[in-house]
Amino acid sequence: MYFATMRLAPTITLTCLAACALFMPAPASLAQDVPPGINPSFPPYKNVLELFTSQGCDTCPPADHVLAGFADRPNVIAITLPVDIWDYLGWKDTLASDKNSERQRAYAKARGDGAIYTPQVVVNGMIGVNGSNADAIEDALKITDEALRGARIPIRFWYERNTIKIETGDAPAGYHYKDATIWFAVVQKRAEVPIERGDNKGKTLTYTNIVREMLPVGSWNGKAMSLQLARTAIMRPETEAAVVLLQEGKAGPIIGAAWTGLW
């Protein structure tokens, strides 16, 4: 669904929820703490697709299917962020979060185009395209991958008992970053939702890699760093995987990303 008139959202402020309780500095020797069997090197760089979708949007199911295809690629992290912007049409999205809607508005404001619609895929935090158009997503992946070449930051994370450990590398020579945000997202890998009212009434919609919570857990200034999260502070019953994003500002290019399904 598209708005007939695009309007910029109000200024959005995202706060780090109880940041002091969620994370604390890790020792400088964190790289030596990797459990046996885990490769101590950083994983290959990943491209990130964020699909903003809604159960109240009759043009969204094809996009949900397209995202599932991209999620199978080893060099792509594809996540679904259900939004609540169409809840007033008769069906309240059972997976939607107002934080996801805020994130979509923040992207529109950062890009300066005011484009807020569903289904929309934001590619590497830089370009917004129609989520049903696989060719447009492919083109945006190529453009943003090239734009970020040489500028990406190695990042990884792993679980150790009741702790989640995150580690980043240094910025490449010649690049100067300030106030990059480290996001931690908990993910449900799959959900099937029967729709009882609204434009998709009678359908059962399938979703892939649904973000159930996304929190800013730290900031990065271009230097290698590590931090630890209390696992119990962010665990949810439906959590099956997790994603860490390193993003310029809070809605800029995504310069680092990592995924794990071990939860």
Language-model segments: which ranges?
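Bacterial N-terminal signal peptides that target proteins for export
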Residues: Y2-C16
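Intrinsically disordered, low-complexity segments enriched in proline/serine/threonine
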Residues: I12, P27-S29, A63, G218
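Short loop/turn motifs at secondary-structure junctions
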Residues: T13-C16, Y117, E240
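Bacterial N-terminal signal peptides
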Residues: T13-P25
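Active-site-proximal cofactor/substrate-binding loop regions of enzyme domains
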Residues: S29-Y117
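Short loop/turn motifs enriched for small/polar and acidic residues
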Residues: L81-D84, N124, E160
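Short, conserved sequence motifs used for protein processing/export or organelle targeting and
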Residues: T94-G114, M126-W263
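Ligand-binding face of N-terminal immunoglobulin V-set domains in extracellular IgSF glycoproteins
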Residues: V121
